[in-house]
A protein has these predicted regions:
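Amphipathic alpha-helical coiled-coil/heptad-repeat segments
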Residues: 208, 241-264
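Polybasic, glycine- and aromatic-enriched phosphate-binding surface used to engage nucleic acids
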Residues: 4-238, 249-251
Length: 264
């Protein structure tokens, strides 16, 4: 089959798009050199589902108010540790983020056999805040053992480890590395690994113009430019194991191919 002079091969069971000869050459080189992310020592997780963001995701002003309402320094210290920064998909930029001064009340449900759930009785000021939303939080489906607790999250501890945040829907592929103990909401995913240098290395490629182009040959595009960052496609992105900082050189692109990517 041909369309606009571009040959296509539909013999593969993979997702397909119509590519020109130069695009086919670039795609082949990327896939020949790189190892798909699914074969790296990483995991991909989605952000936190609270079931009722109005209660559990708060502004800095509200956080300060809750801390001011703590009975003593011990409660204030516990509460400050419980309330952690949270990112949304729209906050994430390439290699950085614009934090909206939002915080998650992390009244987690624990991890079976490993970590006890949060007991709200230990956080009176937080309880007073959540009680204002009792009618909503008590009826939500996404809750833990009590309405005060968030739903189960087996990868809870990974939020405190090195990770790459990225948005669920984005105009350009934007990944940001963070080793801070912070959360993201359900418009965001993150790549987790215990290997800090590996994550930073992967980030260099994922933020490149070349991989942005390549990803669009895998995923379905939304509108003119946006794409959904489905894990099934992200895990197929090939990253070279050889530590080469020049992305184009790492994949063996020639001048014509580089010029093509730069012009897109």
């Amino acid at each position: 089959m041909q369309q606009s002079g571009a040959p296509c091969d539909f013999s593969s069971s993979d997702s397909w798009v119509i590519l020109s000869p130069i695009e086919q050459s670039i795609k082949r080189k990327i896939e020949a050199v790189g190892t798909p992310l699914k074969d790296w020592d990483i995991n991909i997780y989605r952000g936190v589902l609270t079931g009722y963001n109005e209660a559990f995701i708060i502004s800095t002003e509200k956080r300060d108010e809750i801390l001011a309402n703590c009975a003593d320094d011990a409660e204030r210290t516990r509460t400050a540790e419980l309330i952690r920064p949270i990112l949304r998909g729209r906050d994430i930029k390439r290699y950085g983020y614009n934090w909206a001064n939002l915080w998650l009340i992390n009244t987690h449900n624990g991890i079976k056999g490993k970590l006890d759930r949060i007991h709200i009785e230990d956080y009176p000021a937080v309880k007073a805040h959540l009680d204002q939303y009792w009618d909503k939080i008590s009826k939500r489906a996404d809750k833990g053992e009590t309405p005060y607790n968030l739903r189960n999250c087996a990868y809870l501890e990974d939020f405190s480890k090195p990770k790459l945040f990225y948005a669920d829907i984005t105009q350009n592929l934007n990944f940001v590395y963070s080793d801070e103990y912070m959360f993201c909401n359900n418009t965001t995913y993150f790549i987790a690994s215990t290997h800090t240098e590996q994550l930073q290395y992967i980030s260099h490629f994922l933020n490149s113009r070349l991989i942005d182009w390549y990803y669009r040959t895998l995923s379905v595009q939304l509108g003119a430019n946006a794409v959904r960052m489905f894990s099934i496609y992200v895990l197929e992105i090939p990253i070279p194991h050889e530590h080469e900082t020049d992305v184009y050189k790492a994949y063996g692109l020639n001048r014509e191919e580089i010029a093509f990517i730069e012009s897109n």
